[in-house]
């Protein structure tokens, strides 16, 4: 299996710089029932039954053998709860961590099932990401080659005030960029949108948005070019 290595731009879940994405049938069983019960299941021993959305009991003997091997490989790391986090999405078993040595050890233990590894490629990028959390995002190029900031708005923003803000933003198309979904929410066409956002050109525009949004800015992210990392 070909492994895709990606250069991440920010911390995962505002905490973890590294991510290992694995694909394994039975991932949900391992997540919800733990390593010991999963190994018993793979060996044909009686085990608790999960809801259908949590697991698939119809694994072939080959699938069970693979799950047993994967579980045995990842089990020693599951005790390191302060050093890593596991999230399961269907058959994708994702592991997040901070330490590159730990990343490499996990990779070596479960490499046959690894599809993708993401993280900073240099110590400078790692240090920068840990120091700045989710506030600054590393990029090779700016969004649409121009926008330096992404602004998220509070979902509780009143419709009448959103409409006023949108009217201002439409008059400034060269410094503000709004996605279709966020625009529909701003104009009242959608009652609720998760994390509505816009892109803005520069710090001056950021200030203007703050003035026109009536205190409804939830979060601001700044894009930093990797080539400028030393001076950022």
Q: Where are the predicted features?
A:
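Alpha-helical oligomerization segments
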Residues: 191-232
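Structured alpha/beta or helical-core interaction and ligand-binding surfaces enriched in interleaved
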Residues: 1-191, 221-232
